[in-house]
């Protein structure tokens, strides 16, 4: 059985060590009764060491919002997987829409990052999702299949179980409301079908939804069979809000 998972991406909103410490010190105690749900945070890159120190000895996972496609070398401004390992981090975010749209990351580069993370025993949270809303389930599956085939063509089949897919339809990111629940479930089901068609064991892969997640829609979303958790954005900047989401997932999926 797949363990429920809730994560938060701080992007570049909470950027100082003091702010990050305040958020974590407030949040950690609020999660003590939810051991049935895995949690992780992608803090602002400049606060990773602070995050590592505060989360040492806890089950709260963390990692950077991006990583280099190579272990080391002339890659100015990149973040090495060696640094991730040195921090005792266990997750890395890969392929977010903003990385592709603002920094022009290519699919081939993202695929290399995924493979490198898996080879180094770091769990990649891989962001996938169509740019525009699909008109029907076939169109939706075709759009997702094109992405998945390109991103995961080099991984070993056994590595699928260590992948987390974050389904974030680009047209729903940062909007006032999420995609409709039946649309979300159709996308998650399609992703499982695609994994199976590629030879992976879709029953082991955790797929979480991100895109305008809130307390108001969390239960309805995670009630869906193929949704394993949630990827929270700005709504989770208040510690109690994030804890409330974890609580909802625990009650709904537990």
Curated annotation (Swiss-Prot):
Q: Where is the active site?
A: 96, 168
Q: Which reaction does it catalyse?
A: D-glyceraldehyde 3-phosphate = dihydroxyacetone phosphate
**Origin superkingdom:** Bacteria
Pathway in which this enzyme or protein is active: Carbohydrate biosynthesis; gluconeogenesis; Carbohydrate degradation; glycolysis; D-glyceraldehyde 3-phosphate from glycerone phosphate: step 1/1
The UniProt entry's GO CC annotations, sorted and at most eight, read: cytosol
Q: A Gene Ontology molecular-function term?
A: triose-phosphate isomerase activity
Q: Which gene encodes it?
A: tpiA2
Q: So where does substrate get bound?
A: 9-11, 174, 212
Name this protein carries in UniProt? Probable triosephosphate isomerase 2
Q: Under which EC number(s) is this enzyme classified?
A: 5.3.1.1
Q: Name one GO biological process term.
A: glyceraldehyde-3-phosphate biosynthetic process
Cross-referenced Pfam families: TIM
